[in-house]
Regions:
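Acyl-donor (CoA/ACP) binding surface of acyl/acetyltransferases
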Residues: 1-33, 65-189
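Conserved GNAT-fold acetyl-CoA-binding loop/helix
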Residues: 29-49, 60
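Short, P/G- and charge-enriched loop/turn segments at secondary-structure junctions
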Residues: 49-51, 152-153
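Short loop/turn motifs at secondary-structure junctions and domain boundaries
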Residues: 53-58
Length: 189
């Protein structure tokens, strides 16, 4: 296990997670931001790419497992992503199966991954790169303390897909935390 939250466990994906991964990656509603549901081969490639990331980088997209059921309901984690001009940045990415939507799981997992990126991996800034039409994921990024700071266009299956680059810096979260402590102290006076 990599991370644990109140309701979720995040762990490395295993080959046995393939059926659960397919529930997400082959669902056209879940994959609307990609404009393409994955084939079996694409889903296997996705799974094995995460496993290569674990070995190479020490992180990747992890299986999101619901504690109450023990079922894999999504993926969330940290990956290196291009943000233009040959610049790479750690990204907090998330994707959940439809049955896990509207439960706060994406925010819960994304916040845990953001904190892991800062506190364990030592990154000073993380991003989430989100399609311009993916409002639910943008809302998760905002709840994760992120603000849009740039744009890029990804080319996927012959299509140009505009994306927003949401970021948060460690110092911004620390400042927000201290402001909350100060506000709490003032409220008690």
């Amino acid at each position: 296990m990599i991370l644990e939250t109140a309701r979720l466990r995040l762990r490395e994906m295993e080959d046995g997670d393939f059926p659960a991964l397919c529930r997400m990656l082959q669902d056209p509603v879940v994959m609307y931001a990609y404009e393409h549901a994955f084939s079996d081969q694409e889903a296997w490639d996705w799974l094995h790419n995460q496993q290569r990331r674990y070995s190479r980088d020490g992180f990747g997209l992890w299986a999101v497992v619901e504690k109450a059921t023990g079922e894999m309901v999504g993926q969330c984690g940290i990956t290196w992503q291009s943000v233009g001009d040959d610049r790479q940045m750690p990204e907090v990415g998330y994707l959940l199966e439809r049955a896990a939507w509207h439960k706060g799981y994406a925010t819960e997992a994304a916040q845990a991954c953001r904190d892991y990126a800062f506190d364990t991996l030592g990154f000073q800034e993380v991003c989430s790169i989100i399609r311009d039409n993916n409002l639910p994921s943008q809302a998760v990024a905002r709840r994760n303390g992120m603000t849009p700071r740039g744009t890029l266009v990804k080319h996927y299956y012959g299509m140009d897909m505009p994306h927003l680059i949401f970021t948060v810096r460690r110092t911004e979260l620390e400042k927000e935390k201290w402001n909350g402590v100060a506000d709490s102290a003032i409220d008690k006076q």
